[in-house]
Amino acid sequence: MELVFIRHGQSEWNAKNLFTGWRDVKLSEQGLAEAAAAGKKLKENGYEFDIAFTSVLTRAIKTCNIVLEESDQLFVPQIKTWRLNERHYGQLQGLDKKQTAEQYGDEQVRIWRRSYDTLPPLLDKDDEFSAHKDRRYAHLPADVVPDGENLKVTLERVLPFWEDQIAPAILSGKRVLVAAHGNSLRALAKHIEGISDKDIMGLEIPTGQPLVYKLDDNLKVLEKFYL
């Protein structure tokens, strides 16, 4: 069995080196090209999908659409879920990473970005960019909508969707594409690969590059590689 992850192509805020999180930004020109190249590469290597899962953020949805279009599979059903959203970066969202490091120190920013269990400063629920004010999340209980997350909380958010939707799809024989975000994919990778809390800090997933997992019947990883 195989599973393909793809992190969305470069976003406009990736290009500007800003913290993004749940803020909804578009793909950059480079990001659009990365997604198209990924779709073509998947087609060239014979990858076909029966279902695709993505987040409710534009950059991941757009990447999913482009990948499927470029691989002549735009007909493949897509399921969009908030559970595959990027990690919520709280008050850091929209800030310049370099300037934030100058203000708080490189080590503090590294911990905020890569630590498994350290939360960023939380965003106020009344902030104009709070997810509580976004109709994408209006159906969710207020205590479920995050104001800031670490990777541990992100995994706790993503894991129920893996167990309820993604894993059963793979086990039923479906060929699955997951188009999501750096940290939601890191969280899934941690679970699938059994990566330790310490080692997950060093895992980077590049934008726009298909990551293939070959899995056994228990969804244990047999092989992992980028196309």
Curated annotation (Swiss-Prot):
Pinpoint the site Transition state stabilizer.
181
Q: Which CDD domains match?
A: HP_PGM_like
Key word Kinase present in the record?
Answer: no
Q: Where does substrate bind?
A: 7-14, 20-21, 59, 86-89, 97, 113-114, 182-183
State its Enzyme Commission number(s): 5.4.2.11
Question: Per UniProt, what is one GO molecular function of this protein?
Answer: phosphoglycerate mutase activity
Name the UniProt key words of this record, in alphabetical order.
Gluconeogenesis, Glycolysis, Isomerase
The keyword Isomerase is annotated on this UniProt entry: yes
Q: What positions constitute the catalytic site?
A: 8, 86
Catalysed reactions, semicolon-separated: (2R)-2-phosphoglycerate = (2R)-3-phosphoglycerate
The record's listing under Pfam families reads:
His_Phos_1
Q: How does it assemble?
A: Homodimer.
What HAMAP family does the record point to? PGAM_GpmA
Q: What does this protein do?
A: Catalyzes the interconversion of 2-phosphoglycerate and 3-phosphoglycerate.
Instruction: Indicate what this protein is called per its UniProt record.
Output: 2,3-bisphosphoglycerate-dependent phosphoglycerate mutase
* Gene encoding the protein: gpmA
